[in-house]
Amino acid sequence: MNERYQLNKNLAQMLKGGVIMDVVNAKEAEIAQKAGAVAVMALERVPSDIRKAGGVARMSDPKMIKDIQSAVSIPVMAKVRIGHFVEAQVLEALSIDYIDESEVLTPADEEFHIDKHTFKVPFVCGAKNLGEALRRISEGASMIRTKGEAGTGNVVEAVRHMRTVTNEIRKVQSASKQELMTIAKEFGAPYDLILYVHENGKLPVINFAAGGIATPADAALMMQLGCDGVFVGSGIFKSSDPAKRAKAIVKATTYYNDPQIIAEVSEELGTAMDSIDVRELTGNSLYASRGW
């Protein structure tokens, strides 16, 4: 199990510095690949459409996932509901490259997340703080992402989650070794992972930004805050010129410390996706509150 998990973590490392794009069909997957995406996330509806439709959001149709797998050579990810291990079994049977146990879909289990150690395929999970990230890693997640607020086009929650994780890592790192057991209890995280953070000053897996990234500047902001890469959901294919915006976000993610390049790629991108002020969201509309 440990060898498999190490392999999965190494596989996830190969995505570092890249952009992963949500796509709903083979044509969009081809556009994403051509723009330089390191992977695509196959799903029937992007988060902004899931918000509008309401109801229960589930795993995508296997036929649609297979069509996208056939269309591109880059890795293909797909989402499952929190706790829905059978949806994960189905995706593994489809030879999916990565599974996202996602709060964007309607949770299937309000008590347990999936035991990811029972799968060969690597998992990515969302987290809004260090305790949540370490709990998911202890369950077998090979990659973490901020939760943000998907489908809003508003990066504020992704920024909040990244800053929270960074600040909590600093707290653990600066603590004395004697304090670590108390901190592990406070964060609801395993002691061995708290010890890793204390000794290394980082998560044991890569951490991507997700939720609300809509512009090249948003992507660069998250990279400058310390993310290892970015997920872009509705921000590309809900804009007026998806191909151009996709290329621009990829370039801004690569050259995130060069304002000149970010300025150049931000010119004449057309209209960004329709956005939502996160402060207007309440209750079940706040996807980041799903999971624990």
Curated annotation (Swiss-Prot):
Ranges annotated as spanning the membrane: none
EC number(s) per entry: 4.3.3.6
Keyword presence, Lyase: yes
Record: residues binding D-ribose 5-phosphate: 22, 151, 212, 233-234
Binding sites annotated in the UniProt record for D-glyceraldehyde 3-phosphate: 163
Pfam families: SOR_SNZ
Keywords from the named record: Lyase, Pyridoxal phosphate, Schiff base
GO BP terms, alphabetized: amino acid metabolic process; pyridoxal phosphate biosynthetic process; pyridoxine biosynthetic process
InterPro entries per UniProt: Aldolase_TIM, PdxS/SNZ, PdxS/SNZ_N, RibuloseP-bd_barrel
Pathway entry: Cofactor biosynthesis; pyridoxal 5'-phosphate biosynthesis
Reaction(s) catalysed by this chain's protein: aldehydo-D-ribose 5-phosphate + D-glyceraldehyde 3-phosphate + L-glutamine = pyridoxal 5'-phosphate + L-glutamate + phosphate + 3 H2O + H(+)
Glycosyltransferase listed as a keyword: no
Active-site residues from the entry: 79
Function: Catalyzes the formation of pyridoxal 5'-phosphate from ribose 5-phosphate (RBP), glyceraldehyde 3-phosphate (G3P) and ammonia. The ammonia is provided by the PdxT subunit. Can also use ribulose 5-phosphate and dihydroxyacetone phosphate as substrates, resulting from enzyme-catalyzed isomerization of RBP and G3P, respectively.
Subunit architecture: In the presence of PdxT, forms a dodecamer of heterodimers.
HAMAP family: PdxS
Family statement drawn from the similarity comment of this UniProt entry: Belongs to the PdxS/SNZ family.
NCBIfam families assigned: PRK04180.1, pyridoxal 5'-phosphate synthase lyase subunit PdxS
This protein's name: Pyridoxal 5'-phosphate synthase subunit PdxS
Gene name for this UniProt entry: pdxS
